């Protein structure tokens, strides 16, 4: 005899435990599970838990060398999704000892590693995570956070304004720097490298950094305002990424940038630590996110990627506009924006938030609005997202018929008009267009922008929508 019962047993016999009471130290997950025909939801939910904790496909004798009951993940509740056939939300608890401290990489490797390829599942999506306070305290988080950034920039009481330099690829470093200067001189707070601007043959990174630094210091001197350009440090190796961040700091630049999903969480966390130690702000782009989060029944919701970014570290992150060209349903978007900015967020299924999340004073992240927005969107953006956001107009600045600087002027005037109207008690949602028209009477740059983009709409139905609420 081998001393144990060999063979295969159903996952639900071990990992489905509806009587389990969750602990404050557990990582909790909500999965949207779509089982294959004939697979009970309890078995599908338990299978996910097994593969992401202590399980394998058969009983093994080394199970007897540890306490599986202590370390196994547990599926503690399953509920059907209203309006969907054969779709369930499975709630899972993971013991904290399964995860390495301060490692988003390890957390995701465990929770969303192999399980998404299970044959027993037609589809699987991670909808939300509750990260326990004990685990949060092992992370540095954002390099600086919202309040420290405002203090560094000396900018209060309004959203920050940015612009992505276009065309994103093909400009020489000097012409690129010229566009940066014109936008900053016109009134923007930031300009930005696009996510795929790294170090290509037409514009090597060092040349771009030098011309952009010259542009922002010249604009600062002429306006008396602190300016920044998101210098993209993303590179093919972590060593090269850090070399670029070091050079940016040596130039005196206030902010660098990273593509956190394509660059990876290990690289991102390393860069965030360097930024805190050296006084650099860190702008995060979410390139590749829609590959992971776009489909409603498979992948991972962006609210999970947003929480992971806050743990890994970033002072800004792109997070949808609601009104522009990119995906973003209002209630869902505001839910994960609060998860980025606020210190404590209550469970609220009407906004897609499955768990109450306490961030125990981890610094917050500014949500960046970008993608197909222009001056007519300014009232809605100001009203929806409030002051703690970055409004980034690429084509909505550089597409101005009079040039880059007038495009920046138009956006700054529109923003100041909206903030002033809001502070006077006017309703931006109801009076937004009138507020912009009034401001355009004394700003020819804004008037020209209003004329160009008066008929631009992106009216497409969102792919990712909320489930019907349970009674």
Curated annotation (Swiss-Prot):
The modification N6-carboxylysine is found at residue 192. Substrate binds at residues 114, 164, 168, 286, 318, 370. It is found in: Plastid, Chloroplast. Keywords: Calvin cycle, Carbon dioxide fixation, Chloroplast, Disulfide bond, Lyase, Magnesium, Metal-binding, Methylation, Monooxygenase, Oxidoreductase, Photorespiration, Photosynthesis, Plastid. One of its GO terms (cellular component) is chloroplast. The active site is at 166 (proton acceptor), 285 (proton acceptor). The record marks 325 as: Transition state stabilizer. Its EC number is 4.1.1.39. One of its GO terms (biological process) is reductive pentose-phosphate cycle. Mg(2+) binds at residues 192, 194-195. CDD domains: RuBisCO_large_I. The modification N6,N6,N6-trimethyllysine is found at residue 5. The keyword Repeat does not apply. It holds the Pfam family RuBisCO_large. Its cofactor is Mg(2+). The disulfide bond which can form in the large chain dimeric partners within the hexadecamer appears to be associated with oxidative stress and protein turnover. InterPro entries: RuBisCO (IPR033966), RuBisCo_large_chain_AS (IPR020878), RuBisCO_lsu_C (IPR000685), RuBisCO_lsu_C_sf (IPR036376), RuBisCO_lsu_fd_N (IPR017443), RuBisCO_lsu_N_sf (IPR036422), RuBisCO_lsuI (IPR020888). It catalyses: 2 (2R)-3-phosphoglycerate + 2 H(+) = D-ribulose 1,5-bisphosphate + CO2 + H2O; D-ribulose 1,5-bisphosphate + O2 = 2-phosphoglycolate + (2R)-3-phosphoglycerate + 2 H(+). Binds 1 Mg(2+) ion per subunit. One of its GO terms (molecular function) is magnesium ion binding. Heterohexadecamer of 8 large chains and 8 small chains; disulfide-linked. The disulfide link is formed within the large subunit homodimers. RuBisCO catalyzes two reactions: the carboxylation of D-ribulose 1,5-bisphosphate, the primary event in carbon dioxide fixation, as well as the oxidative fragmentation of the pentose substrate in the photorespiration process. Both reactions occur simultaneously and in competition at the same active site. The basic functional RuBisCO is composed of a large chain homodimer in a 'head-to-tail' conformation. In form I RuBisCO this homodimer is arranged in a barrel-like tetramer with the small subunits forming a tetrameric 'cap' on each end of the 'barrel'. Belongs to the RuBisCO large chain family. Type I subfamily. This is Ribulose bisphosphate carboxylase large chain. The gene is rbcL.
